[in-house]
Amino acid sequence: MPLHWTIDSKTKLLTAVAEGDVTRAEFESYLDMIDQAGLHTYRKLFDGMGADTSMGPEHILAMGVRMRTSHQTRPVGPLAVAVAEDKVAMFSRVLGMLAAATRPMRVFHDAGPARDWILKQPPGKSAAT
């Protein structure tokens, strides 16, 4: 599977790695998992350095709308995104939507600095705290 993830409940860190062609269905499964497991306030590291997608702009935008809608209804944790420089233009609208959430977020062009940064961020606060 081109998209796999690891959940560390002790450190409240969700690490996702995308490799190869990530389909809309695979990314939807990732978002469904976040919803079902209640991981919205976890710190998230998304390593897309080895990723590509055959999704068209309309599908990428639909994923951005889904994530943005989720951010408007519940608190979310910090996000570090590692993406190759040549892919930034493809995802720029979605990255802009994600940046609008009330949480720390940074985009990196290397997974190492992204990991270093996200580990320094505290997890998000739940609505109950």
What kind of feature is each model-predicted range?
Residues M1-T129:
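Amphipathic, Lys/Arg-enriched alpha-helical "gate/interface" segment within cytosolic domains
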